[in-house]
């Protein structure tokens, strides 16, 4: 079962968007290398004074390998936008029987007509 990884820092979401826009090739390269390490899904979110990354990975170890390998690329960007150390948490999906949405993240089961 895959895990959700959240990474939260205090920082400037607008500055992150600006840096991403100015460094699209670097961002795409990081994303591609993350996919090569097993990344399933990824988003950045921002709130007043906070930045959060929400990823889905096969397991925590896949993320950790990626994170360690990419510090030379991610670190300088984090230094420009973050005002705190990252808080990384791994979450497992709870089976509560009330799932709604997110079906678009994975292809439908073989033979399914669900879109």
PLM feature segments, named:
Residues 76:
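Active-site phosphate/pyrophosphate- and oxyanion-stabilizing loops and adjacent acidic/basic residues
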Residues 1-52, 56-72, 80-115:
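Short S/T/G/P-rich N-terminal loop/turn motif that feeds into the first structured element of a domain
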């Amino acid at each position: 079962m895959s895990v959700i990884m959240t990474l939260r820092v205090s920082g400037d979401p607008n500055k992150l968007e600006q840096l991403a826009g100015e460094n699209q090739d670097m961002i795409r390269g990081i994303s591609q290398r993350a996919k090569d390490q097993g990344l399933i899904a990824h988003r950045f979110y921002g709130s007043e004074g906070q930045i959060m990354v929400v990823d889905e990975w096969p397991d925590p170890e896949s993320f950790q390998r990626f994170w360690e390998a990419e510090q030379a690329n991610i670190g300088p960007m984090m230094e420009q936008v973050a005002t705190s150390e990252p808080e990384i948490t791994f979450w497992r999906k709870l089976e509560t029987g009330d799932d709604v949405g997110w079906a678009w993240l994975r292809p439908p089961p073989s033979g399914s007509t669900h879109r």
